[in-house]
């Protein structure tokens, strides 16, 4: 009887271990409803269940660091290369050896040590009101510092990582002093106080509070179905020089994960053409894998030249970007 009890106990332990091996947990700052459809597809294809824990990126990183080996996180997924770079600096990620990821994800959209990878691209460009302007009025981000735009520019706060990363990319291209001069010009041209998010800025442009702004394109895509925003138009910035600023959403495998094999499978799945098209369509961002179809809502904007800076620099230059914004009076 004792022998049978031991055998049953071992069977239960093995069964529980197998169950855990067939589950993954993602800590993410992305909205769960954006990820759940593709994770359901992953489960159907592989039998691996994925649990989501969502929250603020900084809070999640701190939790992973504090919990250490006790953390349930297998994957950390977030938006902006600057945040992914911070996670790598905090030793949250482990290096991933995957020929699939190395082949599918372009070098400039992933960490040099393969600790994190971009799975969608986010273009940040100019949007204007056609009640006031036409596309021929615009050229570059830098031109928006010209006094001719005084009182007509609206911007999101520099306290959010999106504009910090844009500034970081400009520092990489132009150096600190020239970029500071450009950002100071933006501040001089502001029509109102800075806004807390891109949607509020777009609504301000549409209502005539200002005439032009810089936003991530998916925010505009989300407003396209509402006729009250029909006057908003997109302009691809810097097409004759460095190209449109592009950032990413991405992920890496947490170094304390006990399920790295399945975690790699999920990251590889994210880089598949099927997942790229499914995911990019859901979030209205751009796929990173060449040849993948893009969302119909944004296809009408056409192709654009993008700045192919290695997105790791958006992280390594983040402190300089924050200091520059303070020096330029950009709140």
Language-model-detected regions and their locations in the chain:
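Early extracytoplasmic/lumenal segment of secretory-pathway proteins
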Residues: 16-85, 331
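Periplasmic-binding protein-like
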Residues: 151-159, 269-293
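Short, low-complexity disordered leader/linker segments with a strong preference
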Residues: 1-23
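A bilobed periplasmic-binding-protein/Venus flytrap-type ligand-binding module shared by bacterial periplasmic
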Residues: 125-132, 246-259, 278
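An extracytoplasmic/periplasmic, membrane-proximal ligand-sensing/linker region
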Residues: 285-331
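Short amphipathic alpha-helical coupling segments at ligand-binding clamshell hinges
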Residues: 38, 182, 249, 258-270, ...
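A ligand-binding cleft/hinge motif common to bilobed small-molecule-binding domains
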Residues: 82-86, 206, 211-232
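Extracytoplasmic ligand-binding site segments that recognize negatively charged/polar headgroups
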Residues: 29, 36, 72-209, 244
């Amino acid at each position: 009887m004792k022998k049978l009890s031991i055998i049953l106990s071992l069977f239960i332990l093995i069964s529980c271990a197998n169950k855990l091996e067939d589950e993954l947990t993602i800590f993410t700052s992305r909205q769960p409803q954006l990820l759940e459809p593709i994770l359901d597809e992953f489960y159907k294809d592989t039998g691996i269940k994925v649990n989501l824990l969502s929250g603020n990126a900084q809070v999640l990183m701190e939790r992973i660091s504090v919990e250490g080996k006790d953390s349930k996180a297998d994957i950390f997924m977030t938006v902006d290369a600057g945040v992914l770079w911070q996670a790598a600096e905090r030793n949250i990620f482990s290096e991933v050896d995957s020929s699939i990821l190395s082949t599918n994800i372009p070098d400039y959209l992933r960490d040099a040590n393969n600790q994190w990878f971009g799975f969608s691209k986010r273009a940040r460009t100019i949007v204007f009101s056609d009640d006031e302007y036409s596309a021929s009025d615009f050229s570059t981000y830098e031109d928006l510092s010209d006094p001719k735009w005084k009182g007509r520019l609206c911007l999101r706060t520099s306290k959010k990582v999106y504009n910090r990363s844009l500034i970081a990319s400009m520092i990489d291209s132009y150096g600190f002093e020239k970029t500071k001069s450009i950002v100071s010009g933006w501040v001089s041209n502001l029509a109102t106080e800075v806004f807390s998010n891109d949607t509020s800025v777009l609504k301000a442009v549409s209502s005539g509070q200002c005439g032009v702004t810089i936003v991530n394109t998916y925010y505009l895509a989300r407003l396209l179905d509402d006729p009250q925003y029909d006057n908003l138009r997109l302009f691809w910035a810097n097409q004759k020089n460095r190209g449109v600023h592009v950032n990413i959403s991405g992920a890496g495998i947490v170094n304390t994960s006990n399920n790295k094999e399945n975690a790699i499978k999920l990251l590889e799945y994210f880089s598949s053409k099927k997942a790229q098209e499914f995911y990019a369509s859901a979030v209205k961002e751009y796929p990173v894998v060449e040849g993948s179809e893009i969302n119909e809502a944004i296809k009408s904007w056409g192709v654009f030249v993008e700045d192919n800076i290695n997105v790791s620099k958006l992280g390594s230059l983040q402190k300089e970007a924050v200091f520059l914004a303070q020096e330029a009076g950009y709140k």
